[in-house]
Regions:
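Residue-level signal for alpha-helical context at structural boundaries
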Residues: 34-38, 145, 162
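Conserved acetyl-CoA-binding loop-helix of GNAT-fold acetyltransferases
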Residues: 98, 104-117, 142, 146
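Conserved active-site alpha-helix within GNAT-family acetyltransferase domains
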Residues: 109, 121, 125, 133-154
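Generic leucine side-chain signal with a strong bias for well-ordered alpha-helical environments
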Residues: 116-119, 162
Length: 162
């Protein structure tokens, strides 16, 4: 079966939120190991609610923001948010995820190629995506590189207990 892309609809919310939580739980476990529980809870205590709030505002009324879902065998298995900056002509691949049980099937590639094509149609002359430099984000970095992202500005987030 082929992965199909379509616009996000309100009835996709619960499934997309579950994909988001399932896909990002390993990242947050690593964050907690790295930061320690005390700082992790200060920074990320409500990470699931933050995703729920963000996704609950989709589809966005802002024409610069589009959200699409990936369907495989009739099931929503991924999603991608794109943001077009008409001023800079730079498009962004924003929040996105593939359900863990559907990863490594080419769905991410399909989503990113779709997103890049859509951004180009909307006037983008360049595109960017942000991801973590930690080991939990290594698959995401590989996926972005596989669709042609080839320049990166490293960034670090430092924390300390006060």
């Amino acid at each position: 079966m082929i992965c199909q892309m379509r616009p996000f609809e309100k009835q996709d919310y619960e499934r997309v939120l579950q994909i988001c939580i399932d896909a990002f739980t390993p990242h947050h476990r690593l964050f907690e190991q790295t930061l320690g529980s005390e700082i992790f809870l200060l920074q990320y205590h409500d990470w699931r609610e933050q995703y729920a709030d963000y996704l609950g505002k989709l589809p966005s009324s802002d024409p610069a923001v589009k959200t699409h879902v990936a369907e495989f065998d009739g099931e929503v298995v991924g999603f991608v948010v794109t943001i077009m900056n008409d001023k800079t002509k730079i498009g962004e691949i924003g929040l996105n995820a593939v359900a863990p049980d559907h990863q490594h099937k080419g769905i991410g590639r399909t989503m990113y190629e779709f997103a890049l094509t859509d951004l180009k149609k909307r006037g983008a002359e360049a595109a960017y995506v942000s991801t973590g430099a930690d080991s939990a984000h290594a698959p995401a970095r590989a996926a972005y590189e596989a669709v042609g992202f080839d320049r990166a500005i490293p960034s670090m987030h430092y924390f300390r207990k006060l």
